[in-house]
Amino acid sequence: MDIATLVVVGLVIITALTFDFTNGFHDTANAMATSIATGALKPKTAVIAAGTLNLVGAFLSTEVAKTISGGIINEQAVTIGPEFIFAGLVGAIIWNLLTWLVGLPSSSSHALFGGLVGAVIIGAGIEGVNFGAVLAKVLIPALVSPIVAGLAAFVAVKLIYFIVKKMSKEQIVNGFRHGQTVTACLVALSHGTNDAQKTMGIITLTLIAVGAQGAGTGPQLWVVAVCGLAIAAGTYMGGWRVIRTLGKGLTEISTPQGFAAEAASATTILVSSHMGFALSTTQVCSGSIIGTGLGKPGNKVNWGVAARMLVAWLVTFPAAGLVGAAACALAKTGLGGTIAVAFIAVVAALVIFRLSKRNPVNSGNVNEASEVKIKPSTSTKVATAA
């Protein structure tokens, strides 16, 4: 392995772990939004628990990682350079940060797949993508999983309210608040078994691409460990902006609803991880929350927020793909092009973080509103007033 390739591989691993970190704080909401919204868990306690269980979950299975490293990209038919994978990761990270900025719970998984597919098509040609695997392991689960989780949550919440109809409100709240502690932890654990593995698969694919690991092999232990730590660290940061949208924006959530939503989500994700389906945990959790909103008598679903989320889901794959393709077009020109892409990505990330400071969302104010709005800068307000 020459020096230039070694530098690019190192850059890919760092970028992959950065994506894993953004996945953690972007998707913390999946596990903890409903428990925080109902008061079952304090915000900081929730993210500490979620981070710890994401780390544990990362060690429980590698089936999804194998889908990424040896499934959707046809590394045996074409030569996949590490710079292609790097470009795909850049596409995923930029889209993750943009949707985090506006508080949209879009799919980190689909951002990753979209960025990777776009980069590989530009870098190696359309034959570099195994579209059969993309359809069977990614797109079909993306359509089916939120519906399954939503139906399960709908039935569960109907059953719960039938069983507890003679109980006092205090008994219901206290009982299901304890139950939510368990189910929220299960969702966090299941998130680790699915989402952390995607980055493991990316790093493994990179090692296979440069001949450092045999084709068809799974992730090495050090890869599992660093990916688990990265997603746990990101989760600990708390994706408060997305937590606000999921916990307050879709529907008003009671403790029985939170319990039902989390139980349905955890079951769907764990079964899918065991089968190697690289589904979107965001879509699963959103579907289950909508299911509970429809299932509770007299409750309403905010279809405006749901529509915004649906648009984000539909746009994520192609949008990340376009960014990944553009990044690959520059990165494949050589080491200088790859470094230029890295510089542009860092600048874009800094701009997004600066914009987020105009309307910060944190553990202290996460439940104070139902959506995230980006406030104009002071200079903009002055200019408008003038």
Task: Label every PLM stretch briefly.
Residues 1-386:
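Multi-pass alpha-helical transmembrane bundle typical of ion/small-solute transporters
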